[in-house]
Amino acid sequence: MRDAGEGKQKHGQQEHIETLPLFSTTDKNGRMTMLRPGRRVGRAAPLIPWLITAAALWALTGSVPFGALLGMAPTPAINMLLGHPVTVGVAVLLLFVAIVMTGAVYSLSMEQFGQTRVAGLFSTLSVTGGLAAVAGVLLLWTLTSNPSRPFDLEAIATSPTIPLELGAVVGASFALWAAIALLRLPGSIAHARRRQADIERLRVEGSSYTGALTAVNFTNSWLFNLPIFTVEVNYIVDGAPRVVPAHMRTSDDRVPVVGSRMIVLTDDRGTTHVELDLASGAAFEPDVGKYAPSDG
């Protein structure tokens, strides 16, 4: 077995060590929530500037395909400008910057709220919101600069060239996607904050017990290549044994073995949180490829 404290970890691996494995007695998959020791309950305000910046980059990047390829340039001169090789080259560079910025939005969202569902919604909103915005601006600009031009969706099928209407439909699709993400975001943030508040409260006010991992069952499913398990944790309260079922998400090289020491936090409200006791020298499954996702 591999000892958790064996060797020194590189700085880039520290976050991986602190957050995995992740346990939840109430949620599973993307709704599982973490709160690192010493962190406060997450806030959305610090993410807004990053979200707006990422969306703006996607809008700038999307102006080229929407304007030059999807017929949404308001004038022939702007169409030529957007289709110029230099403009296309700049758009490609902006695309890479936008991808990096979107990754930063995801990482910062995870840092704030500790939940992949919330992080995914923030990053999705940055992409779809930016593309929907530029499509809307170009569509409005084109229609106002040429009010006599009819807007007919049938042109998508009948026009010999790529019509404005096709770009409008693509833009509307991104707008719908962005609206769905935006509508789901407040509830997801509230859920993550409640879970983090529970964890924070249990660490300060809850009763702490030493437990043991007595069952680890692989569900044969993964979330972003991270295997998902159902587990059972046994602990003793006033001489009586108790069992806590939980979901676990981890990496294939950090699957704790049966018998690993656990920390169980509970309160009078019936809220329970479990964590792996890394300080005790937890042992992990030695076959690191056992739970890796198959290529097929």
Per-range role (PLM):
Residues R2-G296:
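Oxidizing extracytosolic/periplasmic lumen-facing domains
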